[in-house]
């Protein structure tokens, strides 16, 4: 999944308009114009399409955490320079205040069965012997399950 796909999916799941999206970026200390946001949200084959880079997506996810959980006291965390699916999944879990069992249920809503041990392997340090890279399929199914839960209730 591309960063733009993730941004589009989260926007759809939460039914956010442009103003809300721009305020989420702003809460994480990144000013984004409506024009810039529009370019990130366009289909990949559109001539005006622009790639959303890792620090920009990390800033959005930090802003989403601020929006959903409240802004932390003190300085805003610096956005990661490089994102992995593992980090994205972790940030989404924090934003939506999800525990491991909640994530497993969301994956089941998307017809994907993952054990608790497999899930915990995604959140280990990369140099840990049981670390496992989160594949795009897992992230895609997590977002699908989140969509079923939040849009169909």
Predicted segments with their positions:
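Short, solvent-exposed interaction modules
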Residues: 62-113
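Short, structured motif recognition centered on aromatic/hydrophobic residues
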Residues: 6-11, 18-25, 54-64, 88-93, ...
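A cross-kingdom feature marking solvent-exposed beta-strand/loop segments within repeated
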Residues: 1-8, 16-52, 74, 112-136
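A short secondary-structure junction motif
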Residues: 67-71, 126, 149
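Short, Lys/Arg-rich amphipathic alpha-helical interaction segments
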Residues: 131, 135-153
């Amino acid at each position: 999944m591309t960063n733009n796909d993730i941004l589009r999916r989260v926007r759809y799941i939460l039914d956010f308009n442009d103003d809300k999206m721009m305020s989420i970026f702003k809460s994480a200390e990144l000013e984004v114009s409506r024009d810039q946001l529009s370019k990130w949200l366009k289909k990949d084959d559109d001539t005006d399409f622009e790639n959303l880079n890792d620090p920009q997506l990390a800033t959005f996810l930090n802003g989403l955490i601020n929006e959903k959980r409240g802004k932390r006291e003190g300085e805003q965390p610096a956005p990661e320079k490089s994102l992995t699916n593992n980090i994205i999944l972790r940030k989404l879990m924090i934003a939506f205040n999800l525990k491991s069992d909640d994530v497993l249920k969301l994956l089941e809503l998307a017809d994907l069965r993952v054990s608790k041990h497999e899930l915990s392997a995604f959140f280990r340090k990369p140099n840990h012997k049981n670390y496992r890279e989160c594949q795009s399929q897992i992230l895609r199914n997590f977002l699908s399950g989140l969509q079923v839960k939040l849009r169909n209730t």
